[in-house]
Regions:
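Multi-bladed beta-propeller domains
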Residues: 1-3, 28-46, 61, 72-91, ...
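Conserved beta-strand position repeated across blades of beta-propeller domains
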Residues: 8, 49, 94, 135, ...
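Long hydrophobic segments that form regular secondary structure
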Residues: 10-17, 22-25, 265-293
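Residue-level detector of Asp-centered blade-edge/turn motifs that repeat once per structural unit
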Residues: 11-12, 52-53, 97-98, 138-139, ...
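Hydrophobic beta-strand positions that form the internal "hydrophobic ladder"
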Residues: 16, 57, 99-102, 140-143, ...
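Structural signature of WD-repeat beta-propellers
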Residues: 19-20, 64, 106
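Structural motif
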Residues: 25, 66-70, 110-112, 152-156, ...
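Loop/turn-rich, solvent-exposed surfaces of beta-rich toroidal or solenoidal domains
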Residues: 136-137, 141-154, 287-293
Length: 293
């Protein structure tokens, strides 16, 4: 009672998105009014997510008797059900960057992609329980997620929204998780347990392996290269590349580049990149920002 269930931030950072008492609210960071978007006392509305374009909010609700994915305008109004699932428990709606689809997983180990027109695609079904670790590519055409293998390790899979193709990004020989696409769509970063340097405890004389996790990347295509390779900075003569010699410093700097993710499945596992030397730590997750991890 009186507890905030979960929360998020609007794309502009000006309002908070909060679920509490079974309803969905938006709250101003500084000035304005608090809006109760759903205003229902007969349902449990939860796990709300703001679309990247800021126009809609997705949430999960049991108002129909079973949990479904709903969307509502960010200013309020009538909500709309996008799904017609049976008896399922749904979790973690994640918008595509293009704001045209929502990924969600259920308690049966399945990932679904729900388009705004109501089309639902089952991406993957795991026999080992819920898949909670999934991320969209910046072009909204690919998704990366972690599955459990027969050996009990985590392995990363890639799914093409256009073709439905599944690609094995890591084979499960080493535990891998927390996939995150680079902003330019050329690399897939992830965490993996690949180095084991056990230490002896000072008092109990037991071996402890606590620094096995490192940050790695896969070059998604043959042209992606290694972003952490040796650099060779050169001086560019004035006038090269642009009439005023400021191609990257003037108007072009603010233009958004179109990202088109290309995945070459052949040899993907061989294009493995160690992000930072001696970076083994107890790392739990790997979120990606525009130009940083």
């Amino acid at each position: 009672k009186g507890q905030v269930e979960d929360f998020g931030v609007s794309p502009s950072g000006e309002r908070l998105l909060v679920t509490a008492r079974g309803d969905v609210f938006t709250v101003p960071v500084e000035h304005g009014v608090t809006r109760n978007l759903t205003q229902r006392g007969d349902a449990h509305d939860r796990e709300a997510a703001w679309s990247p374009d800021g126009e809609r909010i997705a949430f999960i609700s049991d108002r129909s008797g079973e949990e479904q994915v709903y969307v509502i305008d960010d200013k309020g109004g009538e909500s709309r059900a996008l799904t017609d699932f049976g008896a399922l428990r749904l979790y973690r709606p994640v918008w595509s960057p293009a704001s045209d689809a929502i990924a969600v997983h259920d308690h049966m180990g399945r990932i679904h992609v729900v388009d705004l027109d109501g089309d639902v695609t089952e991406v993957f079904a795991s026999e080992y329980g819920a898949i909670t670790d999934y991320q969209w590519a910046p072009d909204s055409k690919w998704m990366a997620f972690t599955v459990q293998t027969d050996a009990g390790t985590g392995a990363i899979r890639l799914w093409s929204r256009d073709s439905g193709r599944l690609i094995e990004a890591t084979d499960g020989a080493f535990n891998a998780n927390s996939p995150a696409f680079s902003a330019d769509g050329k690399h897939l970063y992830f965490l993996s347990d690949r180095e084991f340097a056990p230490q002896i405890g000072a008092f109990e004389w037991n071996y402890v392996a606590d620094r096995e996790t490192g940050i790695f990347a896969l070059a998604l295509n043959d042209d992606a290269g290694n972003p952490f390779g040796p650099r060779n900075d050169e001086v560019e003569a004035a006038g090269e590349g642009d009439d005023n010699g400021k191609q990257d410093k003037d108007g072009n700097a603010d233009e958004k580049k179109t990202v088109d993710v290309r995945v070459d499945a052949k040899g993907l596992g061989e294009r493995l990149i160690r992000v930072v030397e001696h970076n083994r730590q107890d790392i739990a997750s790997l979120p990606a920002a525009h130009s940083a991890l």
